[in-house]
Amino acid sequence: VRRPLPGPTDSALRVEIITLAPLTIIAKRRVGACPIRDLGPTFGAVWSWAASNGHTTRVRGIYGLPLDDDHYDAGFDFGPDLAAPDGMHLVRIDRCECAQIRMHGPYENLEPALDFLYGGWLPQSGREPADVPLIHRFYNDPDNTPESDLVTDLLLPLRV
């Protein structure tokens, strides 16, 4: 379900309310400040595990959860029936409504969009964030995609 909401005239910062299907992410936690563009080895560790166990065809999505400035969970949704291996963990997110901004371009553009989402859109929306971390949903791999073609959803889970 998608409903556009009033927002800035810049279509790159249009906020929509979507219903996010349940996610079960096998994630590896990055500890220490790190720009998104440098998280490749963290995502790569999960991908290597998936490849060595024949799970790459099960990938439903690529996700990141910025927990705070020094902790980031990077991983993949393989569906609900896999267990996390040693050194990784499961992140389960129930079905929820989210405020979504779809971003096109370099990851450096995410910070201004987050500032708008939290500082501009959220206060005027009448909504409150749920007790679930912000979610990054990545649509392509920065190792083989030009920066200008990167697509990332910023998903802010909302209280019902």
Language-model region placement:
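A solvent-exposed interaction/effector surface
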Residues: V1-V160
